[in-house]
Regions:
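Short beta-strand "wing" residues that participate in macromolecule-binding interfaces
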Residues: 55
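Short acidic, hydrophobic short linear motifs in intrinsically disordered regions
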Residues: 20-30
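Short helix-capping/hinge SLiMs at alpha-helix to coil transitions
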Residues: 15-19, 68
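Pre-recognition alpha-helix immediately N-terminal to the DNA-recognition helix
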Residues: 9-14
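Short, cationic-aromatic polyanion-contact patches
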Residues: 4-7, 58-74
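Glycine-centered, phosphate/nucleic-acid-interacting loop/turn motifs that mediate DNA/RNA or nucleotide
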Residues: 51
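Short, hydrophobic-biased segments on the C-terminal half of alpha helices
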Residues: 41-45
């Protein structure tokens, strides 16, 4: 399993805390300082490419779900 960069790891912590949701949901649970929305959205897309997340489109909203458990990563 590929080691995550610090920014990606912080995003995954927010995602694991939230469970599943949109970028906006993850931004609310992101540790301070919170990144700009667009930065977090790009990070989430990268995490999806690395197979850490799965996504499902509902209307014009993407819902992301962790593909691996936090314990599995650590």
């Amino acid at each position: 399993m590929e080691k995550l960069m610090q920014q990606e790891e912080l995003a995954m912590l927010a995602i694991w805390k939230t469970g599943s949701g949109s970028v906006k949901d993850f931004l609310e649970n992101h540790p301070s300082p919170q990144p700009p929305y667009t930065t977090l959205a790009s990070t989430i897309r990268n995490l999806e490419k690395k197979a850490y997340l799965t996504s499902r489109k509902t209307g014009n909203l993407y819902e992301y779900t962790p593909a691996i458990a936090e314990e599995e990563y650590k």
